[in-house]
Amino acid sequence: MRADTPRLVGRAMTLAYERRTVAEDLTVPVPDGSFTVIIGPNACGKSTLLRALARLLRPAAGAVLLDGADIHRRGTREVARVLGMLPQSSVAPDGITVADLVARGRHPHQGLLRQWSRDDERIVAGAMADTGVADLADRPVDQLSGGQRQRVWIAMALAQQTPLLLLDEPTTYLDIAHQVEVLDLCARLHEEQGRTLVAVLHDLNQAARYATHLVAMRDGAVVAAGEPRRVVTAALVEEVFGLPCRVIDDPETGTPLVVPAARRRVGPAPA
């Protein structure tokens, strides 16, 4: 693998479900050390691309390369030591506690010659501390709020200790406060621990605020990729989403902020 080649690359991929083709000749390199966010309208292929990168969907043509090798020619446990995946809808076994669920992140590192150790205990405790769920360790996961559960799943992915972490719509079904909480956590993992994150998000303004690298998709193709300020323009938003808008600076972060054009003007309230 060349020194300038990212660890994770989707190359010339055709992605399909049975006879329905979602994308053709799709090439997506994931910059090392980035917080990459995939954006686009519904049914454009965002989650399909993420599933392919996560080894959950085999390309009909082309390949996903992990460290220069076809990801489907590598063993499941070997891949799981490098790449973690948080699906869109994760369901915990009934009654399992937070600590026991987070500990499952260590399974790829177990084997006949390597059983549970103090290092595993330390890593699990650290993952729970990093995600702010240590005080919930003995609570059943099914008794937690949506935001708490999502942090627990992220803690399990952290315990897996992979340099690459993929998240499919991690803020789905969460209220705005919990969405910000989860995305702040993802940003901290990227900034403080140097992990490469890839996420699918629906909220364009959240994507522009948190991502260091954006991939904009439409109809199974990449329309633009790069830094948020270069990708999130009024012209591109209208091209990709069909939404006339203005793009201004977010007053809090200076990142691009999409302001939809008014469909109709609302007059002043009657006296």
Language model segments and positions:
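Conserved structural motif at the start of ABC-family nucleotide-binding domains
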Residues: L8, V22-D25
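The feature captures the beta-strand-to-loop junction immediately N-terminal to the Walker
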Residues: I39-P41
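Conserved ABC ATPase signature
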Residues: Q115, P140-L144
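Helix-to-loop junction immediately C-terminal to a conserved catalytic motif
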Residues: A54
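Conserved ABC transporter NBD signature motif
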Residues: G62-D70, V79
